Amino acid sequence: MNEKILKTLEYDKIQQALLGQVVTANGRQLVQAMQPLTDPVAVQQALDETADGASALRLKGGIPVPQLENIDPALKRVDIGAVLNGQELASISRVLQTVSAIDKFLTDLQDQIDFRQLYTLQESLTVLPQLSRRLKTAVDPDGTLTDEASPQLHGVREQIKSIEGEIRGKMTNYTRGAQSKYLSDPIVTIRDDRYVIPVKAEYRAKFGGVVHDQSATGQTLFIEPQAIVALNNRLREAQLAEVAEINRILAELSNELAPYTGQIKANAAVLGHFDFINAKARLAKAEKATEPLVSADNDVLLRDARHPLIDPHKVVGNDIPLGDKYQAMVITGPNTGGKTITLKTLGLLQLMGQSGLFIPADDESRIGIFDEVFADIGDEQSIEQNLSTFSAHMDNIVHILKQLSQNSLVLFDELGAGTDPQEGAALAIAILDAVGEVGAYVVATTHYPELKLYGYNTAKTINASMEFDSKTLQPTYRLLVGVPGRSNAFDISARLGLPGVIVERAKSMISSDSHELNNMISDLEKQRKAAETAYEAARRQLADAQSVHDELAAAYKKFTTERDAQLQQAKDKANTLVDKAQTKADKIIKQLRQMQLTNPGTVKENQLIAAKTALKQLHQDEPLQKNRILRREREKQALHVGDEVKVASYDQTGTLLEQFDKKHWQVQLGILKMKVPTDELKKIKSSKQSAAQRPVVKVSGGGMSGPSTTLDLRGERYDQAMADLDQYIDAALLAGYPSVTIIHGLGTGAIRNGVTQYLKRNRQVKTYGFAPQNAGGSGATIVNFK
């Protein structure tokens, strides 16, 4: 992008605002190097990064990037074998700690926020935990080495503290004891790195020792008393040892950094990028900016676009469309109406968007991707100072025409001004034609009436104007697309008190065509205002409807959530009760089994049926949908005399003998005939086949013959197989078998899986597993009981 346009549109002031948001040296470099991008993919990626930063700012207060100095010079010194000082090591330590903090920050958010680019940027970080801990332990943030930097440093510092304590104790005797009267002041100070006391010159001989300094008047001598000379010597030796150890540690730490300088430098650059993203997000928040859509076809639509350098309390937002149905817009109308500001707003927001910045415009605004943006705006002064002077720069226009392409955006302010009006209008039309022939996009402002007709008659060109309030005689600074500007001179003059005779005489002097054109423009303005009023009413109604819809959706979501929670709570409670009852049932079965083992022949079939319950059938399935399917399936089944059914309350299979009424049937269960409620009956299909395959436990008053140690479920339907398995396991338990074999075959695996799930839930099963290969392999399961 050419440098001239960046200056003309005050792009540098956006950079200055962004610089106020960065906190790292690398971040500042990225802001200073920021330029509008021309690759659509790169533009979208830059906008994605800003969107990620905005999400992090909104949800977590931003990416945790602290102030970081430029560590590149320090790393270069390490590369040549130099020893870094404490401040340089502290700066590098902060970089490494920040890398770890950001890596953890983003890792923790991976299940919460779907960032578009930050996770990819995170992959560029190299976390160096050991080196980071070493520096953090050894170096304080101010660059001072800590006592934990080495045992030797800790020891020598403890020695220094001890000696200093001895010195302070002896010095206290001088400042507070009998000899304090010989001192100028009862204080202890330091001269030449040694502890001294201020002695009156005439009492020099009272203390002996060494004189290190004297006052300006010579009346006070700073004396190191003889009694502490040895202590000061020991202190000095310890201090020198401390310095030597510090230098050794600094060299050691510098050597430890040497293998990682490239990774640390790359980390610092990535942290600068995170800082840059943070800054873009903060600037967007400050400007109430939004993410623009990117149009590869240069279909620009800025909604309620505001210039970012104008006071937000005074700026007027405008909708600025360009590129969809027309590539040229001619804005006509009087001066000081906001035409120049509109041009600059379009140009600057386009540059900001192509730089990956959010723009001060409403949601769903679109920017294009232009290779170049050119402008001929005569004043080139700060719009913050509200200065608008207009002059023609034909040399600049010639330069623009030589460089533009079909992917250029051109902004002309007061095109053709500064010369004879007739010639200026002709030049303006010719220049616009030249731009149109290339296929470039152009917005031009002018006050020449001839260009109004140009806007009507030229393909892909539309007129526009800046609104003027004829009642207040003030511009509103609102852009009216599709409506050319009209002169308000007659209305303004009349309202300011110009005699009506003069106004009417002036009107008679203009051509009828001009008069009709002004009337037509006036009618267009009225129609536009009516359309705007209708649009606003419709928009408000739509917003109200959307609000009601959102409230209803939220209420419905809350209802369904609470309903499901209550149903789940009820199911959990029911399952708890069923589990307790199941435990009791297991105890009963165990007792029956014990009775059969200790006293055969005492267990009757009616006792077995009464002990065996259908509590497992009452256990609620987790998915609610499954229960509904089962209920619907039950409703479809019609019962008839002779049908083989399963009695849910006893978990037994029987035959229907007679229907008493709609709610009860007589069922043959073994040797018993029982009256059973209809809703406890389930019809079993292919009953003859099932009856032939079902294992039978023969029970009589005098004894009970045990079932086989093998159950073959092959060929059965799933429901019948599960019922047979349940009955067989109970019979095997009552028979006292230590283990049995269930043959289920391979097939689709449905029955095998059902067997596995059943055995997993049964409390009487100790272990289970597939049979050996020579005994059926995965087609059979061996069950061991407790």
Swiss-Prot record:
Enzyme class: hydrolase
One Gene Ontology term of the molecular function aspect: ribosomal large subunit binding
Family matches, as PROSITE patterns: DNA_MISMATCH_REPAIR_2, SMR
NCBIfam families from the UniProt entry: mutS2
Domain of life of the organism encoding this protein: Bacteria
Chain ranges of the Smr domain: 711-786
Similarity section: Belongs to the DNA mismatch repair MutS family. MutS2 subfamily.
Taxonomic source organism: Lacticaseibacillus paracasei (strain ATCC 334 / BCRC 17002 / CCUG 31169 / CIP 107868 / KCTC 3260 / NRRL B-441) (Lactobacillus paracasei)
Name of encoding gene: mutS2
Single GO BP term: rescue of stalled ribosome
Keyword Lipid metabolism carried by entry: no
Function: Endonuclease that is involved in the suppression of homologous recombination and thus may have a key role in the control of bacterial genetic diversity. Acts as a ribosome collision sensor, splitting the ribosome into its 2 subunits. Detects stalled/collided 70S ribosomes which it binds and splits by an ATP-hydrolysis driven conformational change. Acts upstream of the ribosome quality control system (RQC), a ribosome-associated complex that mediates the extraction of incompletely synthesized nascent chains from stalled ribosomes and their subsequent degradation. Probably generates substrates for RQC.
Quaternary data: Homodimer. Binds to stalled ribosomes, contacting rRNA.
Keyword set, alphabetical order: ATP-binding, DNA-binding, Endonuclease, Hydrolase, Nuclease, Nucleotide-binding, RNA-binding, rRNA-binding
Residues reported in the UniProt entry to bind ATP: G333, P334, N335, T336, G337, G338, K339, T340
EC number(s) recorded for this UniProt protein: 3.1.-.-, 3.6.4.-
Keyword RNA-binding: yes
Protein name, entry field: Endonuclease MutS2
